[in-house]
Amino acid sequence: MAQISESAAIPRRTANHHGNVWDDDLILSLDSPYGAPAYYERVANLIEEMKHLLLREMEDSNHDLIRRLQIVDTLECLGIDRHFQHEIKTAALDYVYRCWNEKGIGMGSSDSGSKDLDATALGLRALRLHRYNVSSGVLENFKDENGKFFCNLTGDKRVRSMLSLLRASEISFPGEKVMQEAKAFTREYLTQVLAGRGDVTDVDQSLLREVKYALEFPWHWSVPRWEARSFIEIYGQNHSWLKSNINQKVLELAKLDFNILQCIHQKEIQFIVRWWRESEIAQLNFYRKRHVEFYFWVVICIFEPEFSQSRIAFAKICTVATVLDDLYDTHGMLDELKTVTEGVSRWDLPLIDDLPDNIKIAFQFFFNTANELAVEVVKKQGRDMIALLKANWQRYVESYLQEAEWIATRHVPSFDEYIKNARASSGMCIGNLIPLLLLGQLLANNIVEQIHSPSKIQELSELTIRLIDDIRDFEDEKERGEIASAIECYMKDNPDSTVENALNHLEGILHLSLEELNWEFIKQDTVPLCCKKFTFNIVRGLQFVYKYGDGLSISNKEVKDQIFKILIDQVPIEE
């Protein structure tokens, strides 16, 4: 690499990011009625009623296996499964697992000789997600002599079976060829059905909407809150496998639960808005204002009331990280950035006294927020973890300085060199660690080692976050004058490759990494599930907000509408 002199500087560039698309006063004016005790009482009563009704529904059927799986799937899609975890495990999944074998299952426990694709696919998906040991090899039983998947059913039942198979195929681990085959087959089949060119016509409209959702938002692109809002709108009173009185109660609970959670989330985003407005950084136009979008990213993934502190911490960290990103990418001279990096390394605020005011304000914003969050972590965990937090902030800003030096020297590193640095600059080293420590679990040192770098799940989350950003934001970053990206570095290592070749290569790495992440998330170990779920869902959340491009930097389009649906627009409830 070329030698960089102390006087070398990055020209002060302009990123031309759009301003805050949200009126903070509008956010602060939100006042949902769903915090009232009467709504909580109604939800509690509905939960108790439904526990008895659903247990009876599971048992009162010749198709007791698929009925149990349909109930579990419905509760999960509507976002209310957390109220029925005991019933889901003991009455549904334990029961299904006892009937499971290498050839699959039928619709009922009495159908020992008849295997059903819909029931088997639903079971494979649900059992895997709940950490039962089931093999994808069971799907080989649903291939014909030519190795093609088949389904003997017709009409809506055929479409439903293909949809269940698609959703099961997404919960794949590395090397599972049958899952890749199932995914390719069902996506093609359902795409044809949705276009009206399939072998089934006059498909139920609610079912078609489910198909559309599954094709538009595969599992790694879907998130719990968006799925719940979407399925509340899809879910009708015509779910023939549930009695009408249960249908009504399921839908009422889903709507009330969504609105009550939305009320809680509105109070949290109001807290974030006030925190932002009270900081000096809010008065500067140098930096992106995306505090609402960052809160949205985390709340669509981790929505339960008990994780409020982690959500707020994540939104704060991302807001600070974006200020640092803009500083290192756009506004800072190289000598200034070296001073900032040294200030973080030494945790020394006076060190930056001679820097321009906009940089001092940014550093003060970082310094205050990092210290406040460190105090919260120490209180929650009951021991001093300051050194660990400082080390990860240092790793983060040093990766930014490395990128700034590449820009200053017009240096494009090798792909491996870039990825090594990019893992740190993804921000997951700090954006994941602090919220995990605030989830409410006391985490022993050996557990922290299993969830934090260089653990496998942490390394995979860092890699996937960086690849998602580079793949979706490549053109915009190039226009802003950034030299090194995964695509540029791959093309340097492979001079004959095109941008399309590079993108295909990165998509392949991303796909494999997501399958590995599936395994790390689902495998049995000593790490608390809430910790693995947070890490895993944050990756899914970024896929979601980046689906149509960089939805965090360019948030005035699809993401703005999604934020409105999740945080502002109540689900209508008929009185």
From Swiss-Prot:
Its main location: plastid. Pathway: Secondary metabolite biosynthesis; terpenoid biosynthesis; Terpene metabolism; oleoresin biosynthesis. Its EC number is 4.2.3.76. A motif (DDXXD motif) lies at residues 325-329. Mg(2+) 2 binds at D325, D329. (2E,6E)-farnesyl diphosphate binds at R288, D325, D329, R466, D469. This is Delta-selinene-like synthase, chloroplastic.
